[in-house]
A protein has these predicted regions:
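Extracellular ligand-binding/catalytic regions of CAZymes and related secreted enzymes
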Residues: 29-37, 46, 53-61, 80, ...
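Active-site beta->alpha N-cap acidic-glycine motif
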Residues: 548-630
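A glycine-rich, often tryptophan-bearing local segment used as a flexible ligand/cofactor-contacting loop or short
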Residues: 95-179
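Catalytic grooves of carbohydrate-active enzymes
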Residues: 224-227, 500, 504-509, 513-516, ...
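Catalytic beta-strand/loop cores that center a nucleophilic Ser/Cys/Thr
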Residues: 146-236
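Helical hinge/lid and interdomain linker segments adjacent to catalytic or ligand-binding clefts
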Residues: 34-35, 43-128
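Bacterial N-terminal signal peptides
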Residues: 11-23
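Preference for solvent-exposed, low-hydrophobicity sequence contexts
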Residues: 278-557
Length: 808
């Protein structure tokens, strides 16, 4: 019997048993519940792993009838009304479907119940002609009572302190044994926004206030409506799957409690329903994990190839279709595994770097290959055939990449294999049930034959030029879908995430994850959830979804490279504001392939000081690129280590799933980050998603780092909390801006420095949209009271000012 049949039988049994609790009359049938579910609908507040389908399954297991309804159904009074449904679950947080608002209001006014998440009914969303959901902006009155409101209540900032289960435990949460975290950043129901006749039943509390609650709303001649507010996001010490599970349980159990409060369930029926929910599967919680320690195949964090041949086979693949290109990138990886001999041109950036490597003396004249497909014959001895992915399993191409790396195969469609007369050695069509099954195969069957120190999170649609290095180093390619991918074949985001966690638990500390966990709004894990997940398991993301020819570039040895000397800092003037303009996103190695070059050839380059965040692992993966940028530095330029050290991690999440989190922190910062910063002559460090406590322990673990410049943009602190020194003396310059527009930058700096003089400011500038003319204009707008300096000069001036104050 398959799992689906077992689930159906189980649901039928639960429903029949539930009917015996109700009695046998048709009037006593289990209540029907609607769960809002719409592909691509934006989450605002809750984690994107919060699954409408899982909530519906929990309700079905509890004996209720649950239907997934989209926007079209919710907006139709004939398909959604209080006669058909007793309650509606709204799992997307602050966002709601504007088109359905009038019908939702009518449902609520006649006694329909809501299970709410986030700050409900504050962000209406509409779909445009292109099928993209657009947030219409914040609007408070739609949640309130009155002519234009739906009548659920407003919100206020939440209290501080641990979240605890309320007296009486009306949702039976104690049985879950979850850590509900702290409410420091949570907004809660504003009791003052309710009517005097409304009643609050606390579910979770913090600081004496209801953090989650049942709210009964008498409706005059109509039955009461009972809403459940479930705004808490759970403990940040827990992984996202556990937090999403907690949110789902709050909403599903809240529905049961609301229906019981409304009189649609008896006490016995409520008890039974909650007991059934207790028995539902829950995600594995990874804590106190000890990671494996297999032998490391190279001495660096990033994979390194051997020294390339002086004469490379060079071919332009731009005129080939994507399937042919992908096949040749696989061939390139297999050829270059032993010694880099093939360089493929997929855009103008590749031509630039090929010419640059010749000018640098790394390469001699290439061997031109007019027809790229002739490389298949030239290097026929390095591959054994092809592997064919399954078009009915979305992540099947990732599995095919891994098989290609393990078994010396090329990735091809069946049609391409026939066209090129290549034998199909592994056909994945029909091999897997779904994405999760495919990811499980990677972990159980392929991981032992691949390089556990290298992963690659790459969406199927972008697999291409970045594959050469992954295949050459036998990396592990994978992808986990997001809510926008829900209709793609084989997709199950929660099951996929669980499989990914199991895979990460079997990879060593410091394993690199190439690629990027986001491929458009709602596609993939998302940047923040993805980085947090990798960080929890001690894995280092290296953003590199659009790179190429690393299997060639990484082969050139480079142990250390010095930055150009800077002039001395200006004389300290106590009436001035000293600022350092520092561009963002340099941890993204794709940026250095092409997007950053115009900054260094701009006529304004070198006419004023600028700092650039850079991922120091560029010294491993592409030494010729690092050489080019360092050689094009002006004395007024400085590179600092970009987020958040030797790679992209969140200090607040780093190693949380591990038994020895302290050791993992020290390994990443004291050992790897300091080493890579020394190799690239970087003095300053930018970390991201870090509290003041995080910055303090990072400072302890990085005694050789001169200063910190944290944050991805301004986080709302005043000047006293923007610029300060850690107990060990290491200065911290938190971001005071975002930019990149000139007037915005100037206004942000003036506002946030206040009247402090002298002052020292980290002027964060978003790389995306920035250019030298905007930076120059911002400085002109600020005027002579504001002095631009390099990051290291800012550090020197701040330390001098601190000494002078201490001497007084």
């Amino acid at each position: 019997m398959n799992n689906q049949a077992k689930y159906i039988l189980k649901a039928v049994f639960c429903t029949l048993f539930f009917l015996t609790l109700f009695g046998t009359t048709s009037a006593a049938a289990p209540p029907h519940v609607a769960v809002f579910s719409q592909q691509g609908f934006p989450y605002y507040g809750p984690l994107e792993q919060t699954s409408p389908r899982s909530i519906a399954a929990d309700l079905e297991a509890a004996g209720l009838h649950a239907d997934l309804l989209n926007v079209e159904a919710l907006a139709d009074p004939a398909r959604f009304n209080s006669k058909l449904y007793a309650a509606l679950v709204l799992p997307y947080g602050n966002t709601y479907p504007q088109r359905a608002f009038a019908n939702l209001k009518a449902f609520h006014q006649v006694g329909g119940c809501f299970a709410l998440s986030g700050v409900p009914f504050t962000h209406g969303v509409e779909v445009n002609s292109a099928g993209v959901w657009n947030d219409l902006g914040h609007k408070t009155e739609t949640a309130l009572f009155g002519p234009g409101g739906i009548g659920v209540g407003g919100f206020i900032s939440g209290p501080h302190g641990r979240v605890q289960i309320a007296a009486g435990d009306p949702l039976g949460l104690n049985s879950l044994k979850l850590d509900w975290g702290r409410s420091d950043a949570i907004q809660i129901l504003d009791i003052a926004s309710l009517r005097s006749i409304d009643r609050i039943i606390p579910v979770l509390t913090a600081g004496g206030q209801a953090d989650a609650a049942l709210v009964t709303h008498p409706n005059g001649a109509f039955p009461i409506s009972v809403d459940v507010w479930t705004m808490t996001s759970g403990s940040t010490d827990s992984d996202d799957l556990t937090r999403a599970y907690g949110a789902e349980q709050l909403m599903a159990r809240g529905v049961v409690a609301a229906l019981a409060q409304k009189g649609l369930l008896t006490s016995a029926q409520k008890t039974y329903a909650l007991h059934q929910m207790d028995k539902q599967p829950r995600p594995v919680a990874y804590n106190n994990l000890t990671l494996p320690t297999p032998p490391h195949p190279y001495s660096t964090l990033q994979p390194k190839m051997t020294l390339p041949a002086r004469h490379l086979y060079v071919s332009d693949v731009r005129k080939l279709d994507r399937d042919m290109q992908r096949l040749l990138f696989c061939l390139q990886g297999l050829v270059n595994r032993k010694q880099p001999r093939v360089f493929l041109i997929s855009d103008d950036n590749d031509s630039f770097w090929l010419e640059t490597m010749q000018k640098q003396g790394h390469l001699d004249a290439p061997i031109p290959v007019a027809d790229p497909l002739t490389l298949l014959q030239t290097f026929r001895d390095v591959y054994k055939g092809v592997v064919v992915p399954d078009p009915n399993i979305y992540v099947s191409p990732e599995v095919a990449v891994d098989i290609a790396a393990a078994d010396d195969l090329l990735l091809a469609t069946p049609e391409l294999a026939v066209k090129l007369n290549l034998p199909i050695k592994n056909d994945l069509r029909g091999r897997f049930r779904d994405d999760a099954d495919a990811l499980r195969f990677i972990r159980t069957d392929l991981l032992p034959r691949l390089n556990p120190y290298l992963g690659a999170v790459l969406a199927p649609q972008i697999l291409g030029a970045q594959l050469d290095d992954i295949i050459a180093a036998k990396g592990i390619c994978f992808w986990v879908t997001g809510p926008a991918d829900s209709k793609k074949p084989g997709v199950d985001m929660l099951a996929e995430t669980a499989e990914l966690e199991a895979l990460l638990a079997q990879m060593p500390l410091g394993a690199i994850v190439r690629g990027y966990p986001w491929a458009g709004d709602g596609s993939g894990l998302g940047e923040r959830p993805g980085v947090a997940l990798f960080s929890r398991f001690g894995k280092i993301l290296t953003a590199s979804d659009y790179v190429a020819n690393y299997s060639v570039m990484s082969g050139f040895p480079l142990t250390h490279l010095a930055q150009k000397p800077q002039p001395p800092a200006p004389k300290l003037d106590p009436s001035k504001v000293y600022l350092s303009l520092v561009l963002s996103d340099g941890d993204n190695l794709s940026l250095w392939r092409g997007a950053a070059r115009p900054l260094f050839t701009d006529p304004l380059h070198g006419t004023f000081p600028v700092g650039y965040g850079m991922g120091p692992s560029l010294i491993d993966v592409a030494p010729p690129m690092l050489e080019w940028y360092f050689s094009h530095m002006a004395p007024t330029d400085e590179f600092i280590c970009d987020v958040s050290g030797a790679g992209y991690v969140y200090p607040s999440s780093w190693g949380k799933a591990l038994k020895d989190q302290t050791g993992a922190r020290r390994r990443f910062y004291h050992d790897w980050t300091q080493d890579y910063m020394a190799r690239t002559d970087m003095k300053g460090l930018r970390v991201m998603e870090a509290t003041e406590d995080d910055l303090a322990w990072v400072g302890v673990d990085t005694p050789q780092v001169a200063f910190q410049m944290p944050d991805y943009g301004y986080l709302g602190e005043d000047y006293a909390h923007l610029t300060y020194a850690l107990p060990g003396g290491q200065p911290v310059f938190r971001a005071a801006s975002f930019g990149p527009e000139a007037r915005d930058l100037a206004d942000q700096v003036r506002t946030r420095v206040g009247k402090s003089r002298p002052a020292f400011m980290n002027v964060f500038v978003s790389f995306w949209g920035a250019d030298m003319s905007k930076l120059k204009k911002a400085l002109d707008l600020l005027g002579p009271e504001y002095v631009a300096v390099t990051p290291s000069q800012l550090n020197t001036l701040y330390r001098e000012s601190s000494r002078q104050k201490a001497d007084k």
